[in-house]
């Protein structure tokens, strides 16, 4: 039976159908915006992203994780543009940036405390217990808590 998509019948013009697509992901974690406030701030930025870049936002307790996912067959250009888009977002939120990696606030806090050889403690209370719970979830937190 004739199959027009048979690899044996594909011409060089159709070779692009086999082009490997590359995926690049960039993150920006920021603090201080509700979902609604953040949507207003990034609306213009999001509208001007190319088709091959998708942006998702997840906000919880004023900590937002913005994820940029780019898919294209030109890997070097994709990396360059993804880094550029991430930096553009970082410039918009310069004072509110927690991390440009996929890290939680407790992870970033732990890294800073370890790097500066500092420690943190909290009194036992409802709030203190919740803070302690979030900190001790991070491997190695006994070095600073």
Q: Which role fits each region the language model picked out?
A:
Residues 1-145:
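Non-catalytic beta/alpha edge segments that cap or flank active sites
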């Amino acid at each position: 039976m004739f199959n027009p998509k048979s690899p044996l019948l594909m011409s060089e013009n159709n070779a692009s159908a086999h082009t490997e697509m590359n995926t690049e992901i960039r993150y920006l974690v920021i603090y201080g915006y509700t979902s609604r406030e953040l949507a207003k701030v990034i609306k213009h930025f999001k509208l001007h992203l190319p088709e091959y870049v998708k942006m998702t936002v997840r906000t919880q307790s004023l900590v937002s994780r913005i994820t940029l996912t780019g898919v294209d067959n030109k890997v070097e250009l994709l990396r360059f543009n993804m880094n550029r888009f991430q930096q553009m977002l970082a410039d918009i939120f310069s004072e509110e940036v927690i991390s440009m990696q996929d890290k939680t606030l407790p992870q970033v806090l732990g890294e800073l405390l370890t790097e500066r050889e500092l420690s943190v403690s909290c009194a036992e209370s409802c709030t203190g217990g919740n803070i302690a719970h979030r900190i001790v979830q991070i491997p190695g937190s006994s070095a600073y808590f």
